[in-house]
Structures are given as structure tokens and as C-alpha cells.
A protein has these predicted regions:
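N-terminal signal peptide c-region/cleavage motif recognized by signal peptidases
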Residues: 37-38
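Outer-membrane beta-barrel pore domains
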Residues: 45, 54-61, 90, 97-98, ...
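Surface loops at the rim/top face of extracytoplasmic beta-rich domains
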Residues: 187-202, 225
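Outer membrane beta-barrel
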Residues: 44-185, 196-198, 205-214, 281-284, ...
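Bacterial N-terminal signal peptides that target proteins for export
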Residues: 19-28
Length: 356
């Protein structure tokens, strides 16, 4: 009886606090149940969920800045002995977003093992045109340098393709591998193509010795007049061919990566124009955790180029990488850049990248 009276005598504020406490308990119970369910599902399907992030400080244009890099959510799952899934979602800065950040679906890949090392892949992939794009995802902790080479920033190669293809690896003594992919072309959206043309990617590689890979690739696409490519409207129909070659060696002491892409863009108005984008990276492990490195980039465009933004550029990067462990890396580097449009630029960047 006394308990009932005390409840009646509670103030409105006290009632609200009591309800909020109970609501909090209910929410915590629901979250706990969801986590237990998710853990059970992950165990059944052998699912792995990982994250990657980097923070950096940069001295550029006579000022010091601090910034956040991309936050990468990386999910892999083995559904059974033949089907597997890979998903990669990135949260990154976007000046047009109300929150200054946006979500980008970078990869959704469903893989079916046909037989042995032959696989059928469907979804959104990293276009396998060179070693860097085929090997590294958006987790900066694995990059040998702070950022990608300039040919990526200049959008020389299409980073992603949505479609279907075949993939195989590690055949014979040379450990031969191949990729053949047909997908939506440049300018297509995430749910449909913008024209009737399809892009074709064909790539082969060998691994003659441990830690070495030599590759060659070819890409062909027709970009329709009026296509929106990264915010740029293409005013001509462009027939594009890209041929890339790469050499990669990451040994116990020496690291070497050299890649080059030769682009041919042809229109009925301007004819055929050539572009050559290349870079060379080298590193040497002086101790177990310290790797000094360099990278030289070069972008060379033919006069009259109308698809790529013509900006002949040379850049030199020198830096030091300290590997705290497999999932924590500190990098410090200096970059000198001389470009046709922006002149000379010098900057120093420090980065701390982790995986978790």
C-alpha cells in the first residue's frame, strides 16, 4: 500500500526519469540481442568485418592543416564452399554534403568458384588495369606512400566497373593469372548504363618468383556524347583504349613498383590523341620497421587532348614509413610537383593510418 502511494506521489519529472531508465535498459537489451545474433551469423558464414582510417597533418601554401582521411568499412564473407562476398563502403569528406561527409559504395563483389582457381565474379569491382588498383583497397595503412600515384588523381584509368567477368590465378610454374570483365562503361550510373556500349577489360599477370608480379592489361570503351564523367560533361563521342604494364616486387628488404598506362582517345572531330601516365616507386627496409622510399610521377598529354584534362605534370616524392605493426603505420613525406596548370608546389605531409 505504501509502495502504491509513493508511486502516486511521484512528480512528472521523476516519472519521466523512471521511464527513461527503463527505456534505456530495453534499448541495451535489444542491442545486446542484435550483437549476439550478428556474432552467430558471422560465425555461421565465416564473416569478417574490418575498418580502416587515417588522420594527417600537412604543410602546404604556407599553412599547417589537420585533416581526416577516408574511413573504410571492409566486409568479407564465405557463404559456402563456392560462394563468397566482398563489400567495401567508404565514409569521406564531401563539400556538397550537409554534414561535410558522404557514403560511397566502393565495391560489392559476389564470387562463385567454378573449379579450382577459376572464378566467376559479379558486381562492382576495382578495374584490374594495374597492380595498385588490383591490390590495394581504400585502407591507407597498406599503401606504400601516403596517397595514390598521380595517374589516379588525374583519372587516367576507370577505378571501378560494374559488370561480370572471369578471374583465375596461380596456374603453372609462373603462377599465371587472368581477369576478363565486361561491364557498364565510363559515365554509367550505379544501377544502369547510360548507353548501349559496354567496357571490356582483359588483364594477365605472372608471378615468376615470390613477392614479384608482372602484368599487362587492356581496356576498351566508348564514351557517349553528353556523358557525365565525374561532373564533367563530354561533348564528343570518344573511343578509348588503355594499355597498361606493371612490375611489382615487395621483398624482405627491397620494394619496387613501376607502372605505366598508355591512353588513346579518338573522336571524329579531333582525331586520335595519346596520353602516357607513369610512376616508379622504390623503398628499402633499413630496419624491421623503417622504410625510406621515393616515388616519381609523370603525366604527359598530347596537344589537342579533349577527354582528359591536359595538365603535363612531374612530381617527386621522398618519405619515411614506420610500421608499428601490421595495422598501424606512420608516414612522413615531402612532395615536389610541377604542373602545366598550377606551376610549382611543395608540401610536407604526415599521416597516421590504422586498421581495426
Amino acid at each position: 500500500m505504501l509502495f502504491r502511494v509513493s508511486l502516486l506521489e511521484l512528480s512528472l519529472t521523476e516519472w519521466f526519469r523512471l521511464l527513461m531508465k527503463r527505456k534505456t535498459i530495453y534499448i541495451l537489451l535489444i542491442v545486446a540481442c542484435l550483437l549476439i545474433s550478428l556474432q552467430s551469423i558471422c560465425q555461421i558464414t565465416n564473416t569478417s568485418i574490418k575498418g580502416f582510417i587515417d588522420v594527417r597533418s600537412m604543410y602546404d601554401n604556407n599553412k599547417v592543416s589537420f585533416g581526416l582521411g577516408e574511413q573504410d568499412l571492409f566486409i568479407t564473407s564465405e557463404l559456402n564452399d563456392r560462394f563468397s562476398f566482398l563489400g567495401e563502403t567508404v565514409f569521406k569528406f564531401d563539400s556538397s554534403s550537409f554534414t561535410d561527409f558522404s557514403v560511397s559504395i566502393e565495391r560489392i563483389v559476389i564470387k562463385y568458384n567454378i573449379q579450382g582457381n577459376h572464378n566467376l565474379i559479379i558486381g562492382k569491382i576495382h578495374t584490374p588495369l594495374n597492380y595498385w588498383n588490383d591490390t590495394y583497397h581504400h585502407g591507407r595503412v597498406f599503401f606504400p606512400t601516403i596517397d595514390r600515384p598521380l595517374l589516379f588523381q588525374a583519372e587516367i584509368i576507370p577505378l571501378h566497373t560494374i559488370g561480370a567477368g572471369l578471374q583465375g590465378h596461380d596456374f603453372g610454374k609462373l603462377r599465371f593469372g587472368y581477369d576478363f570483365f565486361v561491364g557498364n562503361g565510363i559515365g554509367a550510373g550505379p544501377v544502369s548504363d547510360n548507353d548501349k556500349y559496354k567496357s571490356v577489360t582483359a588483364a594477365v599477370h605472372i608471378k615468376p618468383v615470390d613477392n614479384m608480379r608482372i602484368g599487362l592489361s587492356y581496356y576498351n570503351d566508348v564514351i557517349s556524347k553528353g556523358a557525365d564523367v565525374e561532373g564533367k560533361i563530354i561533348n564528343w563521342k570518344v573511343n578509348q583504349q588503355l594499355t597498361s604494364g606493371s612490375f611489382a616486387y615487395f621483398g624482405k628488404k627491397v620494394e619496387l613498383l613501376a607502372e605505366s598506362t598508355f591512353g588513346i582517345n579518338r573522336t571524329d572531330t579531333t582525331g586520335t590523341k595519346h596520353t602516357l601516365a607513369s610512376y616508379v616507386y622504390g623503398g628499402y627496409k633499413i630496419k624491421d620497421k623503417f622504410i625510406p622510399y621515393f616515388r616519381v610521377d609523370n603525366l604527359a598529354y598530347q596537344n589537342g587532348e579533349i577527354y582528359f584534362t591536359k595538365n603535363n605534370t612531374t612530381a617527386i616524392v621522398v618519405g619515411m614509413r614506420y610500421e608499428i605493426n601490421f595495422l598501424a603505420v606512420v608516414k612522413l613525406e615531402y612532395q615536389y610537383t610541377h604542373s602545366e596548370l598550377n606551376g610549382i608546389n611543395n608540401k610536407v605531409t604526415a599521416q597516421f593510418a590504422i586498421g581495426f
